[in-house]
Amino acid sequence: MSEAKAPCLCVPTTHVREVLGDLQGFAARNHVLHETLWSLMADGACSFRSRDHARSGYSCETDETQKQIITYLILVGDGRLLTYTRAPSGGETRLHGKRSAGLGGHVEERDVSYTWRDGKSVPYWRGTLDMAAERELAEETNGALVFRPHDTHAILTHTCSPVGFINDDSDAVGRVHLGIVYQVAVTEPQRLTFAHEIADARWEDPQSLDLDQFEGWGRIIVETLREGRIK
């Protein structure tokens, strides 16, 4: 039997639409990003759900009533965007062989951070998203990039911040995922190495890319960068 998949954070699709409307593509939230996240992940809206049908008899991977929350990290450096091909051993199998413009990861129970409110400890979802993004970034860059600048394993300086949301209901993969987009600005991109799931990594000018080579979210990110809508 294949390795078990950890449950991941989901939000009801109806709630996503209540908060974000009929978003198709990228939406920057700028100064209201935190407030939008707070509304999206309000008390009672979020739940951790199985992705492992073989073990539980249910998988959110095919449940279009739920959106899996993905931290989607786009790496930029020297005016170029990291693109890569999804290797057969990594990530969403329905996207293998296509080029991507972001490192995407599920939010798992181990990422949950807490805050104190009304006399009790409750999940702090913005911090939880940051923890998930941090873990994904460290895993995919072999520990070279981490959020904590004092970490002795971090060999390259960078900044990382959430810049908006990405959604695409045009295919089966997109209908069960919602991306929280983080932009990672790397000072020395040429020194980065990546995990084995990241194949044929290149730093490329978004203006020169062939959109037909990219999966759905990748196309959206490239188009958004070309339009200057991610600052």
Residue ranges of each PLM-predicted region?
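N-terminal leader/linker segments that precede catalytic domains of diphosphate-processing enzymes
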Residues: 1-192, 198, 204-231
